[in-house]
UniProtKB/Swiss-Prot annotation:
Region of interaction between pPR and pAP is called Amino conserved domain (ACD). The region of interaction with major capsid protein is called carboxyl conserved domain (CCD). Its EC number is 3.4.21.97. Gene3D superfamilies: Herpesvirus/Caudovirus protease domain. The gene is UL26. It comes from Human herpesvirus 2 (strain HG52) (HHV-2). GO terms for biological process: nuclear capsid assembly; proteolysis; viral release from host cell. Residues 277-317, 595-608 have a biased composition (Low complexity). This is Capsid scaffolding protein. The lineage of its organism: Viruses, Duplodnaviria, Heunggongvirae, Peploviricota, Herviviricetes. One of its GO terms (cellular component) is host cell cytoplasm. Residues 617-637 are annotated as: Interaction with major capsid protein. Belongs to the herpesviridae capsid scaffolding protein family. The active site is at H61 (charge relay system), S129 (charge relay system), H148 (charge relay system). One of its GO terms (molecular function) is serine-type endopeptidase activity.
Length: 637
């Protein structure tokens, strides 16, 4: 149904005229720290202006997707500033066809054709990329330096966010820090260049535009926090009061939200208070798992605080979550409470001998021969020495991190959170430690810090303990010490886990093959009862105990393992020169693949250009460290 509707929209006749769209913005910013060949200085730009040939405007540096022309480029004190004209009916058709009709739903009057196009192109291609020709270090810049300007999602140069509008003045107006001389000069030059175009339009083709716009989305789908980056580039360019750039998380136009539902509380007994319709449902709240929250929740009751039980505001709209920077993990509140309850519940793991190897199936010899002295003892064999219950629980490690965080907050002058216990004592005791004023109305009250005996005078104020004062005025070195202690604790736990895989009193001698006393007699072959993979193998880096025998070769570290011979691979025989390939299997011949438009081959001309458009890269190691940490912590449970 949807494909038929899209086909009808594509096959609909094109509009008679194209909507002229003006685009304006900085092509680069001076002293912005652009790396390498992307950096431009005022002298280079001054030598390259005005361009020798008109600069085309294309999409994502595709020469076959030209949609407009640059009208003027002016050297502003902040960087080169340009104004261009876009007039392409096919670009409007592709964007309108791909966009859903729900994007433009609104309570007020319907948006015009120009407004819909401005919303789509502004939010899909909010940046530009200037393509320059590569030149040597000794080659001076000339008027052929600039090649073209490309509309893209995110440019590599800073501050290259552009504005689109149907009038020239409206496109330039949002740049509040633009020099007045630059504003007048670019307006005059753009008006003169527009007269020379005489209503020209561009038509690169619907198919070429479709593939180019799709490649733009694919190349930037891995971009993290795209709207945050766009907002930052927008501030760098000095844009204020922009109308069509939507840096929000909702996939609708401002003012397109449906009418708010009436407030219905469950305590007022209003009809429909228990309505479970999708419109009235509220998603489960998300909480940020911080170390101090885990520590405070594990030491207190597993029930959440009253403020956490009702995160929805009085208006019925859920509070927006704080923006994450990648240092927090977002999980539902119900799963968070289950994790806290499971961590705080007491565990009584079975006691195991210190350094005992892990339990496993051991391959013994003949059933009637008894246990061999060379095999390791069973896991239940009593060993003298200290017994321990495995690694310490997760609460101890988190408590160390919480102490470091609390010390860091005290060092920075920030008040400790409600769940932080990094500093001894409560707020009540710290309140009594401060010096009281000279005229204290509560002078007659007994001091709670000193014992009171009837008939005796009030004791003198106790001086502040130097150790307490030093602890309260902790410096950065104590914070570092606490962090080092936490890391050391984790390293010790890892060492204990590794030690458990070794024998308690050194490695065991290698296991020799079992020789049956009646092996000389002919007996029918019996299949092995135990798999060979369960044979105990001592670590190869530890030598057997005891002095080596003189004149004898030490036994190998690993016992010989029988390998079942498999079928030998066929030998490669060189084929004669007159050999023919095997005939294809009988059947209908598959139809040839549909020919798709191939991307433009990077020729010598393309290699001589410096394009400033960016593409997000795939990072396969994003969460590998976090997964390893979680697996180690959960493995000790």
């Amino acid at each position: 149904m949807a494909s038929a509707e899209m086909r009808e929209r594509l096959e609909a006749p094109l509009p008679d005229r194209a909507v002229p769209i003006y685009v304006a913005g900085f092509l680069a910013l001076y002293d912005s720290g652009d790396p390498g060949e992307l950096a431009l200085d005022p002298d280079t730009v001054r030598a390259a202006l005005p361009p020798e040939n008109p600069l085309p405007i294309n999409v994502d540096h595709r020469a076959r997707c030209e949609v407009g022309r640059v009208l003027a480029v002016v050297n502003d004190p902040r960087g080169p500033f340009f104004v261009g004209l876009i007039a392409c009916v096919q670009l409007e058709r592709v964007l309108e066809t791909a966009a859903s009709a729900a994007i433009f739903e609104r309570r007020g009057p319907a948006l015009s054709r120009e407004e819909r196009l401005l919303y789509l192109i502004t939010n899909y291609l909010p940046s530009v990329s200037l393509s320059t020709k590569r030149r040597g270090d000794e080659v001076p810049p000339d008027r052929t330096l600039f090649a073209h300007v490309a509309l893209c999602a995110i440019g590599r140069r800073l501050g290259t966010i552009v504005t689109y509008d149907t009038s020239l003045d409206a496109a330039i107006a949002p740049f509040r820090h633009l020099d007045p001389a630059t504003r007048e000069g670019v307006r005059r030059e753009a008006a003169e260049a527009e007269l020379a175009l005489a209503g020209r339009t561009w038509a690169p083709g619907v198919e070429a535009l479709t593939h180019t716009l799709l490649s733009t989305a694919v190349n930037n789908m891995m971009l993290r926090d795209r709207w945050s980056l766009v907002a930052e580039r927008r501030r760098q360019a000095g844009i204020a009061g922009h109308t069509y750039l939507q840096a929000s998380e909702k996939f609708k136009i401002w003012g397109a939200e449906s009418a708010p539902a009436p407030e219905r509380g469950y305590k007022t007994g209003a009809p429909g208070a228990m309505d479970t319709s999708p419109a009235a449902s509220v998603p489960a709240p998300q909480v940020a798992v911080r170390a101090r929250q885990v520590a405070s929740s594990s030491s207190s009751s597993s029930f959440p605080a009253p403020a956490d039980m009702n995160p929805v505001s009085a208006s019925g709209a859920p509070a927006p979550p704080p923006p994450g920077d990648g240092s927090y993990l977002w999980i539902p509140a119900s799963h968070y409470n289950q994790l806290v309850t499971g961590q705080s519940a007491p565990r009584h793991p079975p006691l195991t001998a210190c350094g005992l190897p892990a339990a496993g199936t051991v391959a013994y010899g003949h059933p009637g021969a008894g246990p061999s002295p060379h095999y390791p003892p069973p896991p239940a064999h009593p060993y003298p020495g200290m017994l321990f219950a495995g690694p310490s629980p997760l609460e101890a490690q988190i408590a160390a991190l919480v102490g470091a965080i609390a010390a860091d907050r005290q060092a920075g002058g920030l008040p400790a959170a409600a769940g932080d216990h990094g500093i001894r004592g409560s707020a009540k005791r710290r309140r009594h430690e401060v010096e009281q004023p000279e005229y204290d109305c509560g002078r007659d009250e007994p001091d709670r810090d000193f014992p009171y005996y009837p008939g005796e005078a009030r004791p003198e104020p106790r001086p502040v303990d130097s150790r307490r004062a030093a602890r309260q005025a902790s410096g950065p070195h104590e914070t570092i010490t606490a962090l080092v202690g936490a890391v050391t604790s984790l390293q010790q736990e890892l060492a204990h886990m590794r030690a458990r895989t070794h024998a308690p009193y050194g490695p065991y001698p290698p296991v020799g093959p079992y020789h049956h006393p009646h092996a000389d007699t002919e007996t029918p072959a019996q299949p092995p009862r135990y798999p060979a993979k369960a044979v105990y193998l001592p670590p190869p880096h530890i030598a057997p105990p005891g002095p080596p025998l003189s004149g004898a070769v030490p036994p190998p570290s690993y016992p010989p393992v029988a390998v079942t011979p498999g079928p030998a691979p066929p030998l490669h025989q060189p084929s004669p020169a007159h050999a023919h390939p095997p005939p294809p299997p009988p059947g209908p011949t598959p139809p040839p693949a549909a020919s798709l438009p191939q991307p433009e081959a990077p020729g010598a001309e393309a290699g001589a250009l410096v394009n400033a458009s960016s593409a997000a890269h795939v990072n396969v190691d994003t969460a590998r460290a976090a997964d390893l940490f979680v697996s180690q912590m959960m493995g000790s449970r």
